[in-house]
Every structure is written in C-alpha cells, then in structure tokens.
A protein has these predicted regions:
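Membrane-proximal, lumen/periplasm-facing interface regions of secretory-pathway glyco-
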Residues: 389-430, 442-444, 462, 474, ...
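Membrane-interface alpha helices of multi-pass inner-membrane proteins
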Residues: 10, 109-113, 158-175, 184, ...
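Periplasmic/luminal catalytic loop of GT-C fold multi-pass membrane glycosyltransferases
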Residues: 470-527
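Transmembrane-helix motifs of polytopic, lipid-linked glycan transferases
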Residues: 69-92
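Juxtamembrane membrane-water interface segments that cap and precede transmembrane helices
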Residues: 39-40, 45-57, 228, 232-273
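Short hydrophobic alpha-helices at membrane interfaces in multi-pass membrane enzymes
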Residues: 138-168, 207-212, 298-304
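Short periplasmic/luminal acceptor-recognition loop of GT-C membrane glycosyltransferases, typified by
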Residues: 429-467, 488, 493-500, 530
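Specific aromatic-rich, kink-prone transmembrane helix
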Residues: 81, 112, 124-144, 185-188, ...
C-alpha cells in the first residue's frame, strides 16, 4: 500500500496556513473580477475562472480552515493517482522490504518541500494530469479496439469522453491545460517507440485515432467563448518562463518563484531547498538519460526528463516534477537484502554434492551444519532489514514530531498574517482615504478581497501588466524620489508596505516616514500604512 501511505503523508504535510498570496486575488475574482486602477493589457482572459469558482465556494462554506483541508486532501489524491498504476508492478516480498523505506524517503521530501503544497491552480492541473496518467495509456492502447469492428470498446469510449470533458474544464482552470495534449504526445511517443523497437507496424486506423485524440484535446479551448485567446494563452506562459519578451524578462528575473533554483542558490535564498531540488532533478535527468542509453526509455522516463528540465528552469515547476520522480524512484528501487541473500547463498556449505564441506565432514555433521548455517543466514539476511526499518521508523517519528510542533505555531484562522496585511487591511476598511491606493504585489490580492471598494495598484496577475509599468514599479523601491513624484502625478493618497518578510521596500519606507508630506497612520510589526497629504501639489497650483 505504498501509494496510500504516500498519499496520507502528502495530506498531513499539506496542512499549513494559506501562505500563497495569489489565492486571495483568486478568491476576490470569484466574487467579482478585480480591476486595478492602473492600466492593464487587453484582451483579458480569465483562464482561472473555474478554479476561482471552486475555491470561492469552499471558502464561502468554511473559510480558510476548510480551504486548507480541501487542498490537503487534493494533494493526497494527486500523489495517489500518480502512484496508482504501479501498485501491482512489484511482488509482495519486494513491497514488504521496500515500502517503509520508500515512504520514509517520500515523507522526508514532503517535509522539506511542504510549503510548495499550496492551494494554487497548478494543483488542479496536477489532479487532471493524475487522471490522464491512469486513463490515456489505456485509451491509446491498440488492444482497446474491438477485434470484430473498427469501433472503440464501450469502456474505452467512456474514458475518452471523460478525458475530453476534463480537458474542456481544464482550459478554464489554468493555462497549463496545454500539459494535457503534451502528455498525450508523450504517451504516443512511448507507444510508437516500443512498436518500432519490436518491429511492429501499427494499423493505419490506430495511428489516425492517436492523432485524432491529440487534435481533439488541442481543440477544447475553441469550445469556450474566449476561443482563440484561450488557445494562445499558454504561449504567454512560455514567454514568462523563458523571458523572450521584455515584460516576460522582467518577470522571470525579478519574481522569486519564477527563477531557477541555481539563481536562488547563488543569491542565498532557500539554500537547503535549492540544493535538494537540484540534486533530485539531476538524479531524475541521469536516470532518464541512462534508461534511454540502455534502450529502455518509457513514458515515465520521458516525463521525468521533461519535468526535471522545467523544475531547473523555474522553482515553481518543482511540483510538476515531484510526483513523476516518486513514480520513477518506486519503479527502480534497489534492495540491500537481495545482495545480502546472494552473498549468504554463495557462502552456504549445503549446496551441491561435491561441496568442500562434504569432503571434510560426514553426512550427519553436514545436516547439523546445514541447520546452523541456515539459522545464521536468516539472522544475517534480516539484520540489514531490521536496521533499515528501525531507522525509517525513527526518522518518520522525528518528522511527525516536527510536523505536530509546527501545527501549534499556526494561527487558528489559517491565514498567514506574516504574508498578507491582516491587521492593516481591517484598519483600512474603516478608515477611508482620498486619492488612489499604492500597494505591493503580494498584498494586492488580500486587499482586494477584504476591501473591494478601495481599488488596488497591482496584484499577482503580472501577465496583465506591461514591461514599462513593471520596471517602473520595481524602481520605486530603490528610487524614493521617483515614487514621490509619481505619487503626486497619479494622485496616490495612501500607501501600504510590508516591514519584515519582503524587505524590498525598506529603503523607500525609511525615506517616507520622516517626510512632511507623508504621515504614518497605522503600524504593526509586519505592515505600515502612510497617508499622503498633497500639500506640495496644492501649493504649486
């Protein structure tokens, strides 16, 4: 029951407050599309609409605690779906000897990267990919055609319709819906490669069916009202990933989650996570390349290679790699017990009639020696297993202890008040201001959700902003004079800045606080709110 144990571990380590600040603008958009008072690109495609409706519905029932429980269950389902096809690939003896070690490895990885298990649209994408992981290889299998007719079997036809419906829903959950057709291409590449190795010529109708499935998946965006704009959306994501256009280059270089783990490691950010991430991705790349070199490249190895490359390009893609990595690790594990048994058997003096022991001692002594060696062999062969199991249990207990301790430190509201301005936003709702509001991108979504009447400057939807706008926004942190000039020209009457967990704005805050045109109206240990008096602007007029 390896997949079930890993799923439970994923559920447990996914229980923590809503640390991803983007969830708040998703919740705000679920209520009403959020418009910033600053200019945005057009056309606007709300590719997250269905995801926003779901999280908004869950939040409306039970608030942040229920949303945390909901996403924890979904993460468990994701890993269960990816590991489900392998539940019968191992013998019972192999499972007993390797399951505990495998679960320990998974638990250790989950603990290190637990804060990646957030409630984001990528979670829905992984859920749909997990379903595809189980269904698409069966749908595209030639044996699923009826032997008497050229039609699909009813079960296969039902699975195909289910996949197409999921793809249609996926198009309005996240721009990564393109992973569905790409995974279908990977399945076809693996199947056609196997057929080529075995010198099997696939029937023409089967090849046409394969191509038709991929084209049908690609056509799903056109069944929505946004049509072409929705179809082109993934190209914008690719642009942001590699930084081909100026605005995407700014995003790729300035947003931490979109930077490579190598870049983050050299900057000294999340050093432990980055080192482990790079090591795991490198292991995945080496394993995939080695199997390809040996001529045994399959679907897992294709996906492992692709997701490892994506994770090394941008840290946020690591969650795409992790389920595939666990599948690959599960299918290629090595057992120390097998080597121990081989050594013991080679040393055992009870095999063969011409063995040296039979020449040196009699038959009765041989029987006694046989039982003695058998007993010693069982002890020797079981010793590594006992040590391994004991070590695994100790490590799992240690991780669970740290996890339980972390639960005590969380606020019962399950809102990460260190990352969003909980106290400041509550104060601002009852203390209105004149002019526009300036906020940083991480606080924008929460402010829009808590106080929708006060239009925000920016939120996490960077794809809606131009390169010039984003570059000028980032310059404010290092050029206080530029910010104060724009505050006058743009009629900014209030500004809110983080004080601790996002240190970009420290220099600007230190200049604004003593300035005569700015007044501190709210301050706590995490956020500061300042009002702008416009005195200089009035005197000039």
């Amino acid at each position: 029951m390896f997949f079930l144990a890993v799923a439970v571990a994923a559920v447990l380590f996914s229980i923590f407050p809503l640390t991803d600040t983007d969830i708040w603008w998703h919740l705000a958009c679920a209520r009403e599309w959020v418009q910033t008072w600053t200019p945005s690109r057009s056309p606007v495609v709300n590719v997250h609409e269905y995801f926003q409706r779901v999280v908004g519905f869950v939040y409306g029932i039970g608030g942040a605690p229920l949303l945390v429980a909901f996403k924890a269950v979904l993460w468990g389902i994701v890993f269960a779906l990816f590991l489900l096809p392998q539940r019968k690939t191992c013998t019972e003896s192999q499972s007993k000897s390797a399951t505990l070690a495998g679960v320990t490895l998974a638990a250790l990885i989950f603990f290190i990267f637990r804060y990646h298990f957030e409630i984001r649209p990528v979670l829905v994408s992984l859920l749909f990919l997990g379903i595809y992981w189980n269904l698409l290889p069966k749908i595209l299998n030639s044996s699923r055609f009826s032997t008497r007719t050229s039609s699909l079997e009813p079960r296969t036809f039902f699975m195909l319709i289910s996949v197409l419906v999921i793809q249609w829903l996926w198009c309005k959950c996240q721009g990564l819906y393109i992973l569905g057709p790409l995974f279908a291409v990977a399945v076809l590449a693996s199947a056609w490669l196997d057929a080529w190795r075995l010198k099997i010529k696939l029937p023409k109708r089967l090849r046409l069916f394969h191509v038709g499935v991929v084209l049908a998946l690609l056509a799903m965006p056109f069944l929505h009202s946004e049509g072409l704009n929705l179809f082109l959306y993934p190209f914008g994501l690719l642009d942001r990933l590699v930084g081909m256009t100026p605005s995407a280059a700014v995003f790729a270089s300035e947003i931490a989650e979109n930077r490579s783990p190598f870049t983050l490691l050299m900057a000294g950010e999340n050093a432990l996570e980055c080192v482990v991430m790079i090591a795991l991705c490198a292991a995945g790349l080496v394993f995939a390349a080695w199997t390809a070199f040996k001529g045994r490249c399959g679907l897992i190895h294709i996906c492992l290679f692709a997701t490892a490359v994506l994770a090394l390009i941008a840290e946020r893609n690591f969650v795409l790699f992790l389920p595939v990595f666990l599948c690959g690790a599960r299918g290629s594990r090595f057992e120390a017990r097998g080597l121990t048994r081989l050594v013991v058997r080679s040393l055992s003096p009870v095999e063969g009639p011409n063995h040296v022991s039979r020449l040196l001692i009699g038959d009765n002594s041989t029987k006694v020696l046989k039982h003695l060696v058998s007993y010693i062999s069982s002890l020797v062969s079981s010793f590594p297993s006992l040590v391994s199991r004991l070590s695994s249990l100790v490590l799992i207990g240690f991780l669970l202890g740290l996890w339980a301790r972390s639960l005590l430190a969380y606020d019962s509201s399950m809102v990460a008040f260190q990352r969003v301005p909980v106290g400041a936003a509550a104060w601002m709702t009852i203390h209105p201001h004149e002019g526009h509001l300036f906020n940083d991108d991480r606080a924008g979504g929460y402010l829009a959700f808590v106080n929708p009447d006060d239009s925000i400057y920016i939120d996490g939807r960077f794809i809606l902003k131009t390169a010039d706008f984003f570059e000028r926004y980032l310059r404010y942190a290092d050029e206080p004079a530029l910010f104060m000039h724009d505050a006058d020209s743009l009629h900014i009457g209030r500004a809110i800045f983080p004080l601790r967990y996002y240190a970009r704005w420290g220099n600007l805050v230190s200049v604004l606080v003593p300035h005569e045109d700015w007044e501190v109206v709210y301050r706590d240990s995490l956020y500061i709110v300042l009002n702008h008096s416009f005195r200089n602007l009035v005197s000039e007029r």
